[in-house]
A protein has these predicted regions:
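GST-like domain detector, emphasizing the conserved glutathione-binding G-site
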Residues: 1-98
């Protein structure tokens, strides 16, 4: 089972939530508050000290764009063609500043 850890707001996790929902994967939306975030940070549970993170059977993935790409691959949303795949990456990276 996958477990997406983020605050109870759309923010940097909403596109990930959509991709995970489209993937058909078994996943949990684990909302945390500020106190839980601080506790996870102090415990070293957040690889870069930030959320969102996606906890997988293979380990934890940090950084929203990396998680979105992972979820997109699970959902079959990432093109196999190298050019089209790069265009998808371009879109994801272009959305980051927003």
């Amino acid at each position: 089972m996958l477990r997406l850890v983020y605050f109870p707001s759309p923010g940097r996790a909403e596109a990930i939530r959509i991709a995970l929902s489209l993937s058909g994967a078994d996943w949990e939306d684990a909302s945390i508050d500020g106190a839980r975030f601080q506790a996870m940070k102090e415990a070293g549970d957040l690889p870069w000290g930030m959320v969102p993170v996606l906890q997988t059977p293979d380990g934890t993935i940090a950084e929203s764009s990396a998680i979105l790409r992972y979820a997109g691959r699970l959902a079959g949303l990432v093109p196999e063609d190298p050019y089209q795949s790069a265009k998808a990456d371009e879109f994801i990276d272009g959305m980051e500043p927003l």
